[in-house]
Amino acid sequence: MNGSRALHLSAWLLLCLLCSAAVARDDSCETCRKLVDRFHKGLENTAKKNFGGGNTAWEEKTLSKYESSEIRLVEIIENLCDSSDFECNHMVEEHEEQIEKWWFKMKKKYPDLLKWFCIETIKVCCPPGTYGPDCLACLGGSERPCHGNGFCNGDGTRSGDGLCRCEAEYTGPFCLECADEYFSSERNDTYSLCTACNQACKTCDGPSNEDCKECKNGWIKDDGKCVDLNECASEESPCKDSQYCLNTEGSFLCKECDGSCLGCSGEGPENCKDCATGYVLLAEKCTDVDECDASEQVCSRENETCLNTAGSYKCTCSEGFEDKEGNCVKIMEAENTEVTDGEMGTSASDINISNTAHEDL
């Protein structure tokens, strides 16, 4: 039992290491591509520079031209990576000699730095249309992976399996077959053009609803065509009692009835099956009952006013009155209203206090 567990653990660890290595290779290629992009940016930024010592002609004659000088290379390398980018800095540190070799010896013969450095020298990337440790051709060929209808897994990297991930219109290992809802409008051994079927078709061999092999859900065959199925025409509505069914192309919507309705067959108060409480059928539509206009008073408290609302009414205290313990009582004005006297602003309360004090004396 222990031996079996150890074997399973070893296999699991090996699988993890292989996955980690594949991810690392993929990341290394991306890092190398970014590094090369930054190198080209550095070339642009330093294109019009010189030694800057004041005697440019002497310096270029004595120290070689700035364009291909070590000083320019150092300036470019110093700006290849952000300080926080560990992978980039590690790659530059590990392969700085190869970068220098390309700069001084190989640049004219191999002007494509990405190809020379990332693909052929440190071997972290592959040429376009190839994948994996040995840069094998993607399915469909390296010139046109997946026949131009998808993406090769691992394309241009030392990882992946080379399998095709097809675009929405295509399927099959080589992305040459048409997916559901598409038909082949052009096809040969190396090329396929898939075009969308009519909206009613699940599968088809042409552009119209007469060309459907199968209908989509929400559509049915009728006289050789796929036509919309009207779900709302069924005896039992697919919607709730408080909703009505609205047919759409290939489907339906459940929409809320008007507030005046108790069940409905469509939008608005004129399509009510019955009127909700507080509404009556008037001129073929459910209309609000104005309870406040009834001959019998509905608000019975003194100093109370009736306010009609949609489907109901409210009893509120009249203007100038407020509700206190179930009764509408008059709102009392503040008693301590100050009356000013002259510029000093003496109030009536001040005068009363003064008079009272005077009498006590």
Swiss-Prot record:
Compartments where found: Secreted; Endoplasmic reticulum
Gene: creld2-a
Gene Ontology CC terms: endoplasmic reticulum; extracellular region
Keywords associated with the record: Calcium, Disulfide bond, EGF-like domain, Endoplasmic reticulum, Glycoprotein, Repeat, Secreted, Signal
Spans of repeat FU: 191-238, 251-298
Source organism, top-level taxon: Eukaryota
Disulphide bridges, residue numbers: 138-152, 146-164, 166-175, 292-306, 299-315, 317-328
Signal sequence region: 1-24
Family: Belongs to the CRELD family.
Keyword rRNA-binding part of the UniProt annotation: no
SMART domains listed in its UniProt record: EGF, EGF_CA, FU
Function in brief: Possible role in neuronal acetylcholine receptor transport.
Xref: InterPro entries: DUF3456 (IPR021852), EGF-like_Ca-bd_dom (IPR001881), EGF-like_dom (IPR000742), EGF-type_Asp/Asn_hydroxyl_site (IPR000152), EGF_Ca-bd_CS (IPR018097), Furin_repeat (IPR006212), Growth_fac_rcpt_cys_sf (IPR009030), LE_dom (IPR002049)
Protein name: Cysteine-rich with EGF-like domain protein 2-A
Organism placement in taxonomy: Eukaryota, Metazoa, Chordata, Craniata, Vertebrata
